[in-house]
């Protein structure tokens, strides 16, 4: 196709054959920052555009609306890389008089004009205009979008991105939702699946693994949500086996008791944009070869913020991180997609390749699930990353698809790096590293040693204690994972409760007022000399005995964001606010405990260094057992499933 801007396709026969993604509009009453995920309106417009439905838009006369937005621009480079398509078709149906202009971006973020045409729809019905855009120029990055400039009042009846050929395979999705004591969230997720008729059509089964004591079926809204799903919904009660146990049950039931072609993993505590399911499904069906298709994560509390475009595992220290050319926490309300001058926005136009996708939303083809087997028995953390790495070793890629997304609570509102979950972070990181990493373990151990020192300087003794247990349990071998799948979490919480930094108090007023009223906030040390000086002073302080009075009355009260090692390394008693702001913990320095924990950690790290190569072989030999259906049946099939009918 020519690079010269051109007009619309001839109106004879539509080239829009198979829907890839609809243009979707904000819900009624959405705030401005959320609206910017869907449309960008010119400041010269006389009034805001109004969306009567999720797929139609009313625009005033003499107005300009751009669809260069997160949900409505087309991520062309991902379709160029992963799909069989050579072109994509934009179809817009509207009444009124307007002009539709189509643009694309390069991997640098620079805007290129593709073409445009006037459109006039009157009387009998809307006029349709189509543009077919070549995907060849999108090897390294780029999006496609369109703008509408109106002369008269215009109603966009529908718009969407289409393939010019029929979709291969079948649309037959089994949706799986593990839940634990979140009945309201689970019911909302179930209701969302039937809120959109096109989404409802492609869902053949909904599998809920309910692992809590507060059951979803007992929620007042459950009956209505279940009635809409009919006999497609099944509830499976089981002990609390964590996310990995919940998703393993989903995969087990989907493969054994449905004829689904796609298995969609979804968290219970999310808000989903329903069209995301159709977008992931379209990528699944048009893929050159079977792939895992993941949705991205938006921040539930700051809805215009994208968590990250994609993630990889850093092979230097075997820790997940943002993929190359990706950054965390992009605010689309502040930095719009078409802002080519903003460095953060430019990165959004580069295609990001990933190692895995979070299981907040991830579509797995049946073929891959049958070949790879079940998730690992990890309870929580790293199970999704491991499955992506395992898939990659079998030749199956993972795509984190822009524009397919859910809203989920941000990690910044959680203390999971220091609370009981820190055990699973480390133990499972070691397990997955043993299975899928051939690099020197020195990088991983060095990063953990650095983290241990920081935890001790921050008086996070409970974190170090459970991480020592994590190393011990990893070295106990793979056979141990199933035997402690249900018991590890309560055991870890019990161990952690022995330390004051694990006890959450209602607030700082639960204790006497802080004694040091003159202490100033310490500036963040940036230069190496400043870091060295602060560290040396902190270490010297750690060698001294603590003042017993500081374990009765804290010296200072510190906010979460200020609880850094250089702020806490020279105090003996301090309250620190929890990440969610709902309480405080009273951290207390204890030289004897600190040295005992440090010695235990160094011993375990030395054991890791000596034994890690042998553990690689042990875990890899055990992988067929860890992922086998038969082994999982022994822990999953403990209660009778409930089939929910109309």
Swiss-Prot record:
One Pfam short name: Glft2_N
Top-level taxon in the UniProt lineage: Bacteria
Main location: membrane
Reactions the enzyme catalyzes: beta-D-galactofuranosyl-(1->5)-beta-D-galactofuranosyl-(1->4)-alpha-L-rhamnosyl-(1->3)-N-acetyl-alpha-D-glucosaminyl-diphospho-trans,octa-cis-decaprenol + 28 UDP-alpha-D-galactofuranose = [beta-D-galactofuranosyl-(1->5)-beta-D-galactofuranosyl-(1->6)]14-beta-D-galactofuranosyl-(1->5)-beta-D-galactofuranosyl-(1->4)-alpha-L-rhamnopyranosyl-(1->3)-N-acetyl-alpha-D-glucosaminyl-diphospho-trans,octa-cis-decaprenol + 28 UDP + 28 H(+)
Residues reported in the UniProt entry to bind Mn(2+): 267, 269, 408
The keyword Amino-acid biosynthesis is annotated on this UniProt entry: no
Pathway: Cell wall biogenesis; cell wall polysaccharide biosynthesis
Cell compartments where the protein resides: Cell membrane
Required cofactor(s): Mn(2+); Mg(2+)
Active site: 384 (proton acceptor)
GO CC list: plasma membrane
Swiss-Prot/TrEMBL keywords: Cell membrane, Cell wall biogenesis/degradation, Glycosyltransferase, Magnesium, Manganese, Membrane, Metal-binding, Transferase
Protein family per UniProt: Belongs to the glycosyltransferase 2 family.
Protein name, as recorded: Galactofuranosyltransferase GlfT2
Primary gene name: glfT2
